[in-house]
């Protein structure tokens, strides 16, 4: 398990970043909410990570706080939501907005995320 990556931010792309740590450049998928608040390239960052291992793929997903990482992991526990779907939800809704929508039962707000229909939004709330 890789709990976090700390190093120099060397690249930003549409849905991922690269952090140079030691002698490695580590690619990490991140939601838009993270991309929007990252420091400029060349600055140090600390990204809390979730390592997703599949038969043919290993991917890191990253967040600025442990609580946002935990929200991502809770979304992974919802039937029908994989890591890319969870990342899409957290890109469409800031983690605090998603928490509020879940607490108030606002399925309409959750279903605004791409690929999330009414049934999936209800499963997230439950």
Language-model-derived ranges and their functions:
Residues 1, 71-77, 86-89, 101, ...:
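Residue-level recognition of specific faces of alpha-helices
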Residues 1-77:
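Structure-specific DNA junction-binding interface
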Residues 39, 102, 114:
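Short, flexible helix/strand-to-coil boundary loops that buttress conserved ligand/catalytic motifs
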Residues 51, 58-63, 83-102, 123-126:
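Amphipathic, charged-and-aliphatic alpha-helical interface segments
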Residues 111-114, 124:
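Glycine- and Gly-Pro-enriched alpha-helical subdomains that act as flexible
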């Amino acid at each position: 398990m890789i709990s976090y990556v700390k190093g120099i931010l060397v690249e930003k792309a549409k849905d991922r970043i690269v952090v140079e740590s030691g002698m490695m450049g580590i690619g990490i998928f991140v939601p838009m909410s993270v991309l929007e608040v990252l420091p400029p390239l060349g600055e140090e960052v600390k990204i809390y990570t979730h390592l997703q291992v599949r038969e043919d793929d290993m991917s890191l997903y990253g967040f600025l706080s442990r609580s946002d990482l935990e929200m991502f992991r809770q979304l992974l526990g919802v039937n029908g939501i994989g890591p890319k779907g969870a990342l899409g939800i957290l890109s469409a809704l800031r983690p605090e907005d998603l928490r509020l929508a879940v607490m108030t039962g606002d399925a309409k707000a959750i279903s605004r995320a791409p690929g999330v229909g009414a049934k999936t939004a209800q499963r997230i709330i439950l």
